[in-house]
């Protein structure tokens, strides 16, 4: 296939013995043809495109030797090296446009440029023989930035102070100059690199070559290429122009002419043979490059490689890309020959006998790598060439240490070759030879040979990051075919010039910062902060030397951003001049006046972070502040940094600080007048150090761009130093302090710094206004908008009829309903929103009268009002947690305190909605939040401990005390001065003096500190001082008028006063709150009229006959008939149902049968013992179809046709099985129901009409068959035919009826047709009404006129529905109803049910209201309709209405003596506690006449707790006064309180005194399971249970140990006091004591507790037991 001889004697395409090409060209004996038929000079088989092969061993596609190139061009053995695109060829070449050029044998650059050419050609073939570079079309052009950079000056306009001004601008980009406007910055940079203008002092002696062919003369010694190789002689430019260097600086030493990329002419020509681009060398590479011998693309032998690199002639082996190897040679990827074979990743090869490529077919079995190099037997390397043996080889980067692993960039290495085949003793990626450690890519030495990646010739010893110079002593191979001749170039060795200020070692960077700064100052490419060097590792991560070099390279072309030159000032509109702000960051920084002179100054201490963690977590001590300003110059950081000055100068901004000005209006008194200054700085919101200073209006009007500090930075540093070292301000307690702390005003430097980082002034925005109504802030909005208000101006005022809404995004809004008139109002200045706060009319002087303008009732919505956790300082936004905390209730309390009306709180958005009557300030203060869900007052008491002031303070400490709050003066009630008397020593005062700090937890109620709102405060406290026997009351918010002098307070370290001593005996008493509904009467009442006339206005006489109505069970009411006569009247409510009792029971049995009961669990709404259980909740399963059928059967059995109709309608509207097409089927069933009901609603005479009107009457009843018969009878065959056809195919007949109507209309005969007949045609044509014009009059006919809603809806369902469902027909019917053409279905139960089925959002309450019968107390139909709708899934009825329905129906059943079913109905109540209360109340009412069997049935059938039934019976048994029965019922009801009372007071004492041990044992057995639940059981009832146990133990002869335990327990309980015990209990205890006495006496173990027994009992004991030997006892009586 590819030209090889086959084993079967023929080629792949049927050729003879000679090889043929891929497309079947015949190959002669001594002539082979390439892909396009060109003859090749050598005989033998051919390669992929016809290349001949001489040796059996070949590459993957057949290695060729001495044959043609990839396209069959013959190649002659030469010593020249061709370039990538065909440079350096002996034969005549043609350019892309056919121009020929001659080339001498020489090596070429990357794109075919010959080195040392005297004549080159342009892209179109024109010859350029002059030393100067050629342009695109051969013309001589100026390349590079030879002209000095001068920024073009132009003009522009901008808005300043509301006016348009013209300013001058400079385009700080070199490509904006007219001389470079046709090139980009990258093109200019490449041209400068080609011309070796990369840094000052390159030393060129002639003009540099441009990008497209400009020639360069020979560089002087010391110049270097891009990657560090110096250029010794002339080279060609990028596209063929002669120059001293290749595009990337590689040196060559020959002087031959080669062609450029697009066919630049070369000097020499030879036999015709074409390359890819038209070059015809004798033998060429892929792109026409000449080589010594022909080679295929993948089978290169001694010719050129894929890119034309020349190799020594070999006989065996070839790599994937045509590299062939001799015994001791191997080629690289691009054909470069190395001394030893190398793998792609640096594996060294031994000298194989025969080599083949990695993909050869039939090659020798020698091991080779993927590119044809044989693998070494004992060597191996890592990805970058690290080997474990000492064999020679090269890595991808040319580094191969003898014994090392990992990445080796330039370490000392043995002889290696680089990634592209160049042989060197050891080098980096670009072929630099290194004999000693070097830079990143390898410092070179003089001993090895090697080339850079792009043909760089290595220089001598020193080497930098990219700028190492080497001196070649042997021929070099470039990466892409440049062959350096073996000649010695004498070069002057000079000091290496760094590319961008970087020398041979990266570690020397810090020593060369002077050079870097000079380059930054003189960089010609403007200012770009994106290219600044970043030294912050937190932002850019780990910076590599490569990235550092790239940044420095770009930075060399940029102007210093922090320069204070005029250019930087002129360009301040691009970058705000933040350098002045950043220059004053830290007080520890001492710098010169010119900040830009020390670019890399590094502060060794971090500036103070006052931003509450907003800065980075760590601070890099090596990070320059100026560099940090570039990367961290966000608005937040600028605010933080500029706030440092504010805190140093003692200034604060009260505008943007939460809780500063906002708290000035609070009713809040801090009775601790003195607070430490450090605590003030930490806690006081007024002196928040993080805040920016207030910016005045004049400063805001200044342009942000041109604002500069008004004070020299050096002076500002000195001023701050003095401010820090000054003494604290004196505290003058004799003058009333301001509402804010008396701090110094904002300094000029601080104001300027703040203005620099502030947002642009408001005047730069074009403010839109309507009649003076405007919004100047972008985050405020209004509804309607300002533009819409322009259309609402009347008489010079904006009149809003539908109200006004003003809001701020993410803060809230205020809505004023009704008519609002505005004029000349800045809405965002009157309505001010802050976090959780709104103020309308912040200036009290500008406030409108109440009820006018915006000082009127409104609805306020504050956003993001969530609870803030005190520990984590995070907002709690979880709805469940907010509910648990009670946040909504807290907001309700705060709303009441503010005098507003709470409306809503939406936890999802934190929206707090309330209504106010007038405006001042409303909101929620930070300290108004509850602590962990506790009420605010409790949180205050828990979080506000007593503040203790130590008396052992110095005068300096007293001076540091700052008064925090304005305190109102007060006068002593007895006008006595508080005298401070001196005492000898402070020890007389004791240790500490507590002073109560009380904070009134009141919300922002908009009130002032007056007495009118005093009653709204919670926990008002008064402080009482006892002075000289008089009591003086100091009201809250006030202070004694005579305040102590400062001198006396300063001497507290040595002495104190009696006033301070009295503080130890401080009495804090709660102030009595006035009653909420106290009657405030006037003076003493006086009799104004006579006694006789006073009877006329006597209220008692007016209501003399009124009496309280008492409701009894079963709905019976009782009232008195006085004063007319002494009678008690009874009345009953008619609760009879429309159905009989059997029907009631049968219907309820259906519900009981299909219902499901489920216990919801214990009630969480009550903790009482009686409410611990709940009744079962009744619900219904989804299988409700059986309910419909049974309801219909019960109604039919009772003869209630109306109920049957309702149940059938519900069954048709809500089918249980909904198969495909169920909607249409439902329409059919509803149509059938409508037919039945329509017949019932029409009189019999109309339905039996046989006249011509009878057709229409039958159509209105839905009977089309009968209408057809009547039409036949009345001689209307056409109508009859069409009616009959419509029953079969309604769609077709619709068009026929319409056509008939159109025909009559055209003939103007519509008015002559009978009305009923015309209605038939209109209806059957699919219309419910029809209109037409005739003789200038409008005529219309309405088919629904005169019909009830059932017939009207039936016409839509029967004839106008087509194949749609019920919803479409109902919608069409509703349109006719709304248009007044049809009767409405509202108010009728079937109509409401149909509406509910078609409109699911319809109210269920409205449907049930229509189910009420004639008797308003009959809820039978309503409740059962509800049960059906509930089972279907309509559960949108409000719980209140639902509960009321259940209670009413239950009362009806109770009045009918159906108590069991009444309980069942009550179990449908959804609320647990309400359901339990209703059921228990009903049980109490029916317990009187209900026997135990009925209760057992109720408990079993409806799962009523037995405890509830027993409790109901217990209430009834109280009237019987049977303690035994009561005790049994109390135990059954688990009424623990009653169990304990009955057992202790009656049951147990009676059994003990009577000696009825069996009854006592039975009672104790009943109580024993509940002993742990009965309160106070151990001190009361356990005496009797222990006594019962003692009797059992004695009777059973138990062990003595058990008896002793019971005796000790019993004796202990007998010592309980007997004050509250009745006589029976005392007697029982004496009886128990007597038994214990007898037992102890028998055991001879009487204790001294016998004193407990009475005298008589003891005498009785002694009398009865005289044989015990009384003489042994000495009994003392008290």
Swiss-Prot record:
Its EC number is 3.4.21.-. The keyword Ribonucleoprotein does not apply. GO terms for cellular component: cytoplasm; kinetochore; nuclear envelope; nuclear membrane; nuclear pore; nuclear pore cytoplasmic filaments; P granule. Residues 777-919 form the Peptidase S59 domain. One of its GO terms (molecular function) is RNA binding. The record marks 919-920 as: Cleavage. Belongs to the nucleoporin GLFG family. This is Nuclear pore complex protein Nup98-Nup96.
């Amino acid at each position: 296939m590819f030209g090889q001889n086959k084993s079967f004697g023929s080629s792949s395409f049927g050729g003879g013995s000679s090889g043929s090409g891929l497309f079947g060209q015949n190959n002669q004996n001594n002539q082979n043809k390439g892909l396009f038929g060109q003859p090749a000079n050598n005989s033998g088989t051919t390669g992929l495109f016809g290349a001949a092969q001489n040796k059996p061993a070949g590459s993957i596609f057949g290695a060729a030797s001495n044959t043609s190139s990839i396209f069959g061009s013959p190649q002659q053995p030469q010593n020249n090296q061709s370039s990538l695109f065909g440079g350096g060829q002996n034969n005549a070449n043609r350019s892309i446009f056919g121009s020929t050029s001659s080339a001498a044998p020489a090596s070429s650059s990357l794109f075919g440029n010959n080195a040392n050419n005297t004549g080159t050609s342009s892209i179109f073939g024109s010859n350029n023989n002059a030393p100067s570079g050629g342009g695109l079309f051969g013309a001589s052009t100026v390349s590079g930035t030879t002209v000095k950079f001068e920024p073009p000056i132009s003009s522009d306009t901008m808005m300043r102070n509301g006016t348009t001004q013209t300013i001058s601008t400079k385009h700080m980009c070199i490509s904006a100059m007219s001389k470079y406007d046709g090139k980009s910055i990258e093109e200019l940079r490449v041209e400068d690199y080609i011309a070796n203008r990369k840094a000052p002092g390159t030393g060129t002696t002639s003009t540099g070559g441009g990008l497209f062919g400009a020639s360069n003369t020979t560089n002087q010694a010391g110049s270097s290429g891009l990657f560090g190789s110096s250029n010794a002689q002339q080279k060609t430019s990028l596209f063929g122009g002669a120059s001293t260097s290749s595009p990337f600086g590689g040196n060559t030493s020959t002087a031959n002419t080669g062609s450029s990329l697009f066919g630049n002419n070369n000097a020499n020509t030879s036999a015709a043979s074409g390359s890819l681009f038209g070059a015809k060398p004798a033998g060429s590479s892929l792109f026409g490059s000449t080589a010594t011998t022909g080679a295929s693309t993948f089978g290169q032998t001694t010719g050129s490689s894929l890119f034309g690199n020349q190799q020594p002639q070999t006989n065996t082996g070839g790599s994937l890309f045509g590299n062939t190897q001799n015994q001791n040679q191997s080629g690289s990827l691009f054909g470069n020959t190395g001394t030893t074979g190398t793998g792609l990743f640096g594996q060294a090869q031994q000298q194989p006998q025969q080599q083949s490529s990695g993909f050869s077919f039939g090659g020798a079995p020698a091991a080779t790598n993927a590119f044809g190099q044989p693998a070494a037997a004992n060597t191996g390397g890592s990805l970058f060439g690290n080997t474990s043996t000492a064999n020679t080889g090269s890595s991808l980067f040319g580094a191969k240490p003898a014994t090392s692993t990992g990445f080796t960039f330039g370490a000392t290495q043995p002889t290696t070759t680089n990634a592209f085949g160049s042989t060197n003793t050891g080098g980096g990626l670009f072929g630099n030879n290194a004999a000693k450690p070097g830079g990143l890519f390898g410092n070179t030495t003089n001993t090895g040979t090697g080339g850079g990646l792009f043909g760089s010739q290595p220089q001598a010893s020193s080497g930098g990051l990219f700028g190492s110079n080497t001196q070649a002593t042997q021929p070099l191979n470039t990466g892409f075919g440049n062959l350096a001749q073996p000649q010695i170039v004498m070069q002057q060795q000079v000091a290496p010039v760094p590319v961008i200020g970087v020398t041979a070692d990266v570690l020397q960077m810090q020593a060369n910062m002077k050079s870097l700064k000079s380059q930054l100052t003189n960089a010609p490419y403007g200012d770009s902060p994106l290219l600044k060097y970043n030294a912050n590792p937190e932002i850019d991560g780990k910076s590599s030397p490569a990235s550092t070099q790239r940044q420095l390279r770009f930075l060399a072309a940029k102007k210093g951003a922090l320069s204070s030159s005029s250019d930087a000032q002129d360009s301040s509109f691009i970058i705000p001049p933040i350098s002045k702000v950043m220059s004053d960051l830290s007080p520890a920084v001492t710098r010169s006046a010119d900040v830009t002179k020390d670019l890399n100054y590094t502060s060794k201490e971090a500036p103070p972070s006052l931003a509450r963690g907003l800065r980075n977590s760590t601070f890099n001590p090596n990070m320059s502040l100026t560099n940090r300003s570039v990367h961290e110059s966000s608005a937040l950081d600028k605010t933080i940094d500029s706030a440092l000055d504010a805190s140093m100068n003692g200034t604060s901004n009260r505008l943007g600080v939460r809780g500063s000005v906002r708290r000035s209006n609070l009713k809040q008194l801090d009775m601790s007048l003195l607070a430490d200054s450090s605590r003030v700085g930490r806690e006081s919101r007024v002196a928040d150090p993080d805040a920016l200073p207030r910016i005045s209006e004049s400063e805001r009007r200044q342009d942000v761009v041109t604002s500069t500090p008004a004070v020299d930075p050096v002076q500002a540093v000195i001023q701050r130093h003095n401010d820090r070292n000054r003494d604290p301000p004196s505290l003058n307690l004799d003058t009333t302090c301001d509402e804010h702390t008396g701090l110094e005003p904002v300094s000029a430097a601080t104001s300027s710094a703040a203005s620099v980082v502030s947002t642009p002034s408001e005047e730069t925005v074009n403010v839109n206004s309507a009649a003076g109504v405007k919004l100047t802030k972008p985050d405020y909005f209004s509804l309607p908008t300002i533009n819409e208000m322009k259309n609402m101006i009347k008489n010079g005022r904006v009149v809003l009829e539908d109200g006004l809404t003003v809001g701020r995004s993410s803060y809230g809004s205020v809505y004023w309903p009704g008519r609002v008139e505005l004029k000349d109002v800045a809405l965002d200045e009157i309505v001010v929103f802050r976090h959780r706060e709104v103020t309308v009319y912040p200036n009290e002087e500008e406030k409108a009268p109440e009820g006018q303008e915006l000082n009127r009732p409104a609805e306020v919505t504050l956003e993001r009002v969530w609870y803030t956790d005190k520990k984590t300082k995070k907002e709690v936004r979880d709805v469940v947690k907010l509910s648990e905390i009670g946040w909504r209730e807290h907001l309700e309390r705060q709303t009441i305190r503010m005098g507003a009306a709470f409306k809503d709180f939406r936890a999802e958005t934190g929206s707090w909605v309330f209504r106010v009557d007038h405006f001042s300030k409303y909101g929620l203060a930070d300290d108004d939040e509850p602590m962990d869900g506790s009420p605010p007052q409790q949180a205050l008491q828990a979080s506000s401990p007593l503040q203790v002031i130590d008396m052992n303070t110095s005068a300096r400490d007293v001076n540091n005390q700052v008064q925090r709050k304005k305190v109102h003066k007060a006068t002593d009630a007895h006008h006595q001065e508080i005298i401070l008397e001196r005492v000898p020593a402070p020890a007389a005062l004791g240790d500490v003096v507590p002073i109560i700090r009380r904070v009134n937890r009141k919300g922002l109620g908009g009130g002032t500190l007056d007495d009118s709102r005093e009653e709204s405060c919670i926990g008002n406290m008064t402080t009482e001082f006892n002075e000289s026997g008089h009591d003086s009351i100091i009201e809250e918010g006030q202070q004694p008028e005579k305040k102590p002098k400062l001198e006396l307070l300063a001497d507290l370290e040595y002495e104190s006063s009696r006033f301070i001593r009295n503080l130890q005996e401080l009495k804090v008493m709660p102030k009595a709150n006035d009653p909420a509904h106290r009657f405030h009467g006037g003076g003493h009442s006086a009799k104004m009229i006579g006694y006789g006339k006073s009877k006329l206005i006597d209220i008692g006489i007016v209501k003399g006959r009124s009496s309280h109505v008492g409701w009894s069970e079963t709905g019976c009411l009782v009232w008195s008939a006085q004063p007319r006569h002494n009678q008690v009247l009874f009345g009953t409510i008619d609760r009879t149902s429309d159905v009989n009792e059997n029907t009631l029971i049968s219907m309820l049995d259906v519900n009981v049968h299909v219902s499901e009961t489920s216990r919801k669990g214990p009630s969480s709404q009550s903790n009482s013992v009686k409410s611990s259980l709940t009744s079962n909740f009744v619900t219904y399963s989804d299988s409700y179809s059986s309910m419909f059928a049974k309801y219909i059967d019960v109604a039919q059995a009772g003869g209630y046709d109306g109920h049957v109709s309702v149940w059938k309608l519900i069954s048709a509207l809500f089918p249980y099985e909904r198969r495909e097409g169920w909607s249409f089927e439902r329409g059919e069933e509803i149509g059938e129901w409508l037919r039945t009901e329509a017949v019932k609603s029409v009189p019999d005479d109309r339905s039996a009409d046989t006249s011509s009107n009878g057709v229409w009457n039958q159509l209105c009843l839905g009977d089309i068959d009968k209408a057809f018969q009547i039409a036949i009878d009345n001689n209307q065959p056409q109508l009859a035919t069409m009616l009959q056809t419509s029953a079969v195919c309604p769609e077709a007949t619709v068009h026929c009826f319409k056509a008939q109507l159109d025909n009559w209309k055209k003939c103007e005969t519509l008015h002559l047709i009978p009305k009923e007949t015309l209605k038939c045609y209109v209806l059957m044509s699919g219309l419910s009404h029809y209109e037409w014009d005739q003789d200038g009059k409008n005529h219309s006919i309405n088919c629904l006129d005169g019909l009830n809603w059932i017939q009207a809806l039936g016409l839509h369902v029967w004839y106008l529905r087509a194949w749609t469902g019920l919803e479409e027909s109902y919608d069409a019917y509703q349109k006719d109803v709304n248009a007044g053409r049809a009767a409405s279905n509202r108010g009728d139960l079937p109509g409401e049910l149909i509406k509910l089925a078609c409109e699911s959002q319809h109210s269920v309450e409205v449907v049930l209201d229509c189910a009420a019968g004639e008797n308003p107390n009959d809820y039978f139909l309503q409740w059962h309709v509800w049960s059906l709708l509930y089972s279907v899934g309509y559960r949108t009825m409000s719980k209140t209405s639902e509960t009321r329905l259940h209670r009413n129906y239950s009362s009806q059943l109770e009045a009918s003596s159906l108590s069991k079913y009444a309980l069942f109905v009550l179990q449908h109540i959804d609320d647990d506690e309400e359901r339990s209360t209703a059921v228990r109340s009903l049980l109490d009412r029916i317990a009187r006449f209900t026997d135990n069997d009925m209760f057992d049935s109720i408990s079993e059938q409806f799962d009523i707790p037995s405890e509830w039934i027993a409790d109901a019976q217990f209430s009834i048994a109280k009237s019987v006064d049977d303690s035994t029965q009561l005790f049994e019922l109390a135990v059954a009801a688990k009424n623990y309180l009653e169990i304990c009372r009955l057992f202790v007071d009656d049951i147990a004492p009676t059994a003990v005194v009577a000696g009825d041990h069996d009854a006592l044992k039975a009672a104790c057995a009943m109580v024993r399971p509940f002993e742990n639940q009965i309160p106070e059981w151990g001190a009361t009832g356990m005496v009797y249970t222990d006594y019962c146990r003692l009797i059992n133990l004695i009777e059973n002869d138990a062990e003595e140990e058990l008896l002793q335990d019971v005796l000790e327990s019993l004796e202990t309980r007998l010592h309980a006091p007997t004050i509250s015990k009745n006589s029976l209990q005392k007697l029982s205890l004496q009886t128990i004591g007597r038994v214990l006495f007898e037992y102890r006496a028998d055991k001879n173990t009487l204790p001294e507790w016998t004193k407990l027994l009475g005298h008589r009992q003891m005498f009785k004991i002694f009398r009865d037991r005289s044989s015990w030997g009384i003489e042994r006892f000495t009994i003392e009586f008290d």
